[in-house]
């Protein structure tokens, strides 16, 4: 994939068409550890971890200082203080995501090829159980309000809910389309992107029903999702290079932020009020609301294929995963052996 650099400052109009007014300004690619962006965000470091397997979602336990990385058939665990691999969770075939329930001392994976979720101990990383899910579990989240884990099953167009403590499946939620990422607000609501219908659905995590559907037009095929729970805003990264801002209280999209190509994850930092979009073209979009419905955004150069991210709430740094690929080696391309790395962006 090619890298495209740019800086955007845009005032976003609150219209039904979600129009924006702004201009692109040339970006200066700062050297690693340098600061060439107006926002102050830049690549702090790149750490090569190597190891086998491709990757999907990342999850950070900021309190325990651990980073969890899905690696096709296993989960790699990294110490955030030393940048060293400190553990591995095997037997997670087709793993996509990792969810954590720190108060229960448990973690959970979504195993897309096995149609299961692996339960593991957060301290020892030992596997302590397995749960059968719907077909093709992709995103997985923990909802602290209901103390339930939700897997969002792309092949089944539904979500499986199970009790985080017992591992008992408590229900299935039909979603009316193929889900992508989701997030819980901590108050009993779960919000999930539906990529096939370009919507966000609201789920009651206790009743296990979809209570609302929100169209994201003009956003198309949303993948990444992040939640500003305090202000009831849902950020959805869409395939047509915009991040929609959905006000769930108002029931409508109130703004759109232009982003880079090939987004697959989003983040929101409640400590700084900054929203992020990790783009496979090799950029991280950084956006901040400057007035109601108006955002200022900037693209920070990262690395090609760095399209998933996780946020460290302690340092406010963003972690992205990527690797090198052999040129013209087919589709999909072959990864260069032991080239897997994390890219850390911060101030």
Where are these regions (language model features)?
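Predominantly soluble domains enriched in secretory-pathway, periplasmic, or organellar proteins
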Residues: 4, 18-20, 25-347
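Bacterial N-terminal signal peptides that target proteins for export
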Residues: 2-13
